[in-house]
Amino acid sequence: MNTKERKTVEKMLVAFNTNFAMQDEVKVRKIKEKFLKNFTVDVTKNPQYVIQLLETAFSEKNAGDVDESLAIGFMFELFSESFSDILRKLIEADWHFTHEDIASIFQELKLPETVECLYKAALKQFEYLEYDEFFALAVKCIWALGAIKTDAAKEKLKLLARSDNEIISRNALAQLERM
């Protein structure tokens, strides 16, 4: 992501966060229009560009660019199966801070190929989440596994249900009951 793109994303995020509480669809639409006018590529017509931004951020280990690229994806609802490869790599990487966002994307996409990385992420202790006594990332990964509903997802939930961590175990059992 170049400097101009970063500034455009940052302006969009500031404007969106400032106006978000109002839930004003007109203002949100204007923010999106202004972003598309000023950004290098019309991401609504070329979501592959956001994948490229994520791949570059991954190879450069640029946490800020991962965060901002995901923000573009969320703002314009771009996430699809085509994002799977890069997001699977990112959810296992330990140098950024957007694991929960990626787990939420996987929950929406319900892709069987994400089962293994979701399971690993549910168990991984990322340094920046050491304070999280509620294990939000693990819970989001468990809910994503529950949404996938394949035999492989069910097997991973069974393993998680045997966890010594009560929060992980309880959430995995709840997802198994829903399946």
Segment roles from a protein language model:
Residues M1-Q52, E77:
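Intrinsically disordered, serine/threonine- and proline-rich low-complexity regions
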Residues T3-K11, T44-A57, L78-A93, L111-E127, ...:
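Amphipathic alpha-helical scaffolding segments comprising HEAT/armadillo-like alpha-solenoid repeats
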Residues V26-T44, T56, E60-F79, K89, ...:
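Structural detector for internal amphipathic alpha-helices that build alpha-solenoid repeat scaffolds
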Residues N17-F20, F39, L54, F58-N62, ...:
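Generic secondary-structure transition motif, activating predominantly at the C-termini of alpha-helices
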Residues E155-M179:
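A short, hydrophobic/aromatic-rich structural module that often spans a beta strand
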